[in-house]
C-alpha cells in the first residue's frame, strides 16, 4: 500500500496479512444475514488499493469497517488478534475510528454519491448497532442513507434502465438494506 496522503491512517492499522485475514473473516463469517458490502466489487477495489493502482478513501474506510465488525465476531484469543493488547471491543473501535477519519477526509473532498459510499454507510450502521454506543449516530446515518439512496434512484426499478445485471442486483441489495435499517431503527430494534 503506497498511498502517501493517508500514511497517518495506515500507520494505525496492523500488517497487511492481518488486515486481509480480518476482511476474509468478515466475508466468510460475519455477513451471512446482512450483506451490506458487495464482496466481488469490494475485493476487486481492495486489491487495486493495495497495489497502489487506485487510492480511494471509501475503500480504506470500508476495509476498516469490515475489520471492526470482524473483530466483534472473532472468538476470544483468535490468532488474527494475537499481537494486540486491547480487548476485541477496543480494537474494533480503533478500526472504526480509522474508518470514520477516512470517510471524513473523503467527504471533505467530494460530495458525489456512489454505491460504494452507500455500502460503507450501511456497514458503519451495522457496527454502530453492534456496539450499542452511538444511538444518535445511527439515526443520522439512516437519514443520510435514505437521502442518498433516493437521490441515486435506488428505489426505482433498475430493470427499466438496461443496466448490467450485476449492477442492478447490487442496487437492489443496497436499497433493501437501507429499508431494513430504516425499519429496524424506526421500531427500535
Please report, for each region that a protein language model flagged, where it lies by residue.
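C-terminal transcriptional activation/regulatory domains of eukaryotic transcription factors
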Residues: 2-116, 121-134, 161-166
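Hydrophobic (often cysteine-bearing) scaffold residues that line and stabilize catalytic clefts
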Residues: 15, 19, 137-141, 177
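A generic secondary-structure signal for well-formed alpha-helical elements
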Residues: 30, 34, 70, 74, ...
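Classical protein tyrosine phosphatase
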Residues: 132-146
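Enriched - but not universal
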Residues: 35, 49, 142, 178-179
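Fungal transcription factor middle regulatory core
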Residues: 1, 78-80, 101-102, 149-189
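Extended, hydrophobic/aromatic-rich amphipathic alpha-helical segments that build helical scaffolds
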Residues: 69, 120-123, 141-142, 174-177
Amino acid at each position: 500500500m503506497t498511498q502517501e496522503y493517508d500514511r497517518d491512517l495506515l500507520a494505525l492499522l496492523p500488517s497487511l496479512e492481518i488486515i486481509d485475514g480480518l476482511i476474509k473473516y468478515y466475508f466468510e463469517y460475519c455477513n451471512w444475514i446482512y450483506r451490506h458490502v458487495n464482496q466481488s466489487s469490494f475485493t476487486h477495489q481492495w486489491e487495486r488499493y493495495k497495489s497502489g493502482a487506485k487510492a480511494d478513501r471509501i475503500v480504506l474506510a470500508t476495509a476498516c469497517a469490515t475489520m471492526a465488525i470482524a473483530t466483534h465476531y472473532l472468538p476470544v484469543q483468535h490468532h488474527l488478534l494475537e499481537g494486540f493488547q486491547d480487548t476485541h471491543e477496543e480494537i474494533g473501535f480503533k478500526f472504526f475510528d480509522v474508518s470514520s477519519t477516512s470517510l471524513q477526509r473523503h467527504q471533505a473532498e467530494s460530495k458525489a454519491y456512489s454505491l460504494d459510499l452507500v455500502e460503507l454507510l450501511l456497514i458503519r450502521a451495522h457496527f454502530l448497532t453492534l456496539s450499542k454506543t452511538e444511538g444518535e449516530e445511527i439515526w443520522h446515518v439512516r437519514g443520510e442513507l435514505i437521502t442518498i439512496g433516493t437521490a441515486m434512484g435506488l428505489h426505482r426499478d433498475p430493470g427499466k434502465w438496461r443496466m448490467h445485471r450485476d449492477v442492478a442486483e447490487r442496487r437492489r441489495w443496497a436499497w433493501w438494506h437501507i429499508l431494513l435499517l430504516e425499519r429496524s431503527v424506526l421500531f427500535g430494534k
